[in-house]
Structure formats: structure tokens, C-alpha cells
Curated annotation (Swiss-Prot):
Phylogenetic lineage: Bacteria, Pseudomonadati, Pseudomonadota, Gammaproteobacteria, Enterobacterales
Alphabetically ordered keywords of this record: Acyltransferase, Lipopolysaccharide biosynthesis, Transferase
Quaternary organization: Homotrimer.
Gene Ontology MF terms in the entry: acyltransferase activity
Signal peptide region: none
Pathway: Bacterial outer membrane biogenesis; LPS O-antigen biosynthesis
Function of the molecule: Catalyzes the transfer of an acetyl residue from acetyl-CoA onto GDP-perosamine to form GDP-N-acetyl-perosamine.
Keyword hit for Metal-binding: no
Protein name per the record: GDP-perosamine N-acetyltransferase
Reaction equations catalysed: GDP-alpha-D-perosamine + acetyl-CoA = GDP-N-acetyl-alpha-D-perosamine + CoA + H(+)
Species the sequence originates in: Escherichia coli O157:H7
Active site positions: H139 (proton acceptor)
Keyword Transcription: no
E.C. numbers: 2.3.1.227
InterPro entries referenced in this protein's UniProt entry, alphabetically: AcTrfase_PglD-like, Hexapep, PglD_N, Trans_hexapeptide_repeat, Trimer_LpxA-like_sf
Length: 221
């Protein structure tokens, strides 16, 4: 029997675990165990699923173990996934059956593709990508590792999104052109509902229509 663990028993974990449960049943039948892994909630049950600590998950005597990280914070997601990979646990990609992934598309390990997501042709997506409900990635896009698309985020064609970027709910990224893509830099944050019409430097937060850098108020002394 194999053991499958969803790291993070919070909101996205609770949304994701039934998708994985359905996926495993279709692929493997009924001979498996599926749990949450969450050190804060260990020993409890969440939505009917047992919650294990990380240590208990790693020590559990199963034939094979698989995992995914349903934690929205990209830095925590990266830290957890890198740690668990060091223990030889295999990441599993989770894909809802009504999502659409076109041919000639490459998606890295550990992705979560939620309901009503579309990923178009000739796209390349890195590891542990989160595509939340009703988001889409259009043709010829390059998406890095640990990128998050919140619900309804829309990325049009010929866009490069670098590692650890966050695309907020309802945000729209304008298409680039061949050999001159629009670029969202590493760690950039695109705010909810933003309309991005030009490249965004690494580490910058933008919001509005058209999207502009969000300036911090001066700290009072």
C-alpha cells in the first residue's frame, strides 16, 4: 500500500485533497492511504482525513510515499518541498479532471491544477506550480518554479513568469510578442484585479489598471 500526503491542512489543502483522492482512486483503486501532513494539527482529523506530523509521515512504514504541498506561501512551499525531497519522497502532480492541458506542454513535478484551469499549448511550467480555480496560462509562456496563480488569474501568450512570483485573483497579464516576451520578475507580486501591460521587475508589487508599483508609505518616526 502507498501513502499520499498533502502538506498543509489549511484552506488550499482542504480544497486540494478531494481532487487527489479522486485522482488516486481512478489510477490505483482503493489500496492506498491519504493524509494531511501538518505539524500544528497533527493528531486531529480535518474534513475526515487524518493529520500526521512531518516526522510521522516520513517514518510511516508504507511501500512508497508521495507528497504535494498545498501551501500558498511560496517560500514555505519551497522550503517544505526541498526538505521532503531530500528524504526520497516522490512529488505527485495533482490535476482536476475538468481542467484542460493542451498538447506540447511541459509541467514540472508537484503542480496543483485546480478545477476549470486551462493551460495552453507550447508552455513550459516549473515545479510546484499552483493554478487555482478558473486561472489560465495561454500559449508560449514560460513559468518558473513555485509560482502561484490565485483564482481567476489570466496570463496571455508570450509571457515569462520567473520563480516565486504571485499572480493575484482576477489579475490579467497582457500578451508579449515572439522573441520579446513580457516578463514578470522573480518574487514579484501582481495584486488582485491588476491589469499588467508591461514587464514587472523582480521583487516588485504592482496593482491597479494599468498596474503600477505599489509605494510604501514613509515610516513615521
Amino acid at each position: 500500500m502507498n501513502l499520499y500526503g498533502i502538506f498543509g491542512a489549511g484552506s488550499y489543502g482542504r480544497e486540494t485533497i478531494p481532487i487527489l483522492n479522486q485522482q488516486i482512486k481512478q489510477e490505483c483503486g482503493s489500496d492506498y492511504a491519504l493524509v494531511f501532513v501538518d505539524d500544528v494539527l497533527a493528531g486531529k482529523k480535518v474534513n475526515g482525513f487524518e493529520v500526521l506530523s512531518t516526522n510521522c509521515f516520513l517514518k510511516a512504514p508504507y511501500l512508497k510515499k508521495y507528497f504535494n504541498v498545498a501551501i500558498a506561501n511560496d517560500k514555505i512551499r519551497q522550503r517544505v518541498s526541498e526538505s521532503i525531497l531530500l528524504h526520497g519522497v516522490e512529488p505527485i502532480t495533482i490535476k482536476h479532471p475538468n481542467s484542460v492541458v493542451y498538447d506540447h506542454t511541459m509541467i514540472g513535478s508537484g503542480a496543483i491544477i485546480s478545477p476549470f484551469v486551462t493551460i495552453s499549448t507550447n508552455t513550459h511550467i516549473g515545479r510546484f506550480f499552483h493554478a487555482n480555480i478558473y486561472s489560465y496560462v495561454a500559449h508560449d509562456c514560460q513559468i518558473g518554479d513555485y509560482v502561484t496563480f490565485a483564482p481567476g488569474a489570466k496570463c496571455n501568450g508570450y509571457v515569462v513568469i520567473e520563480d516565486n512570483a504571485y499572480i493575484g485573483s482576477g489579475a490579467v497579464i497582457k500578451q508579449g510578442v515572439p522573441n520579446r516576451p513580457l516578463i514578470i520578475g522573480a518574487g514579484a507580486i501582481i495584486g488582485m484585479g491588476a491589469v499588467v501591460t508591461k514587464s514587472v521587475p523582480a521583487g516588485i508589487t504592482v496593482c491597479g489598471n494599468p498596474a503600477r508599483e505599489m509605494k510604501r508609505s514613509p515610516t513615521s518616526i
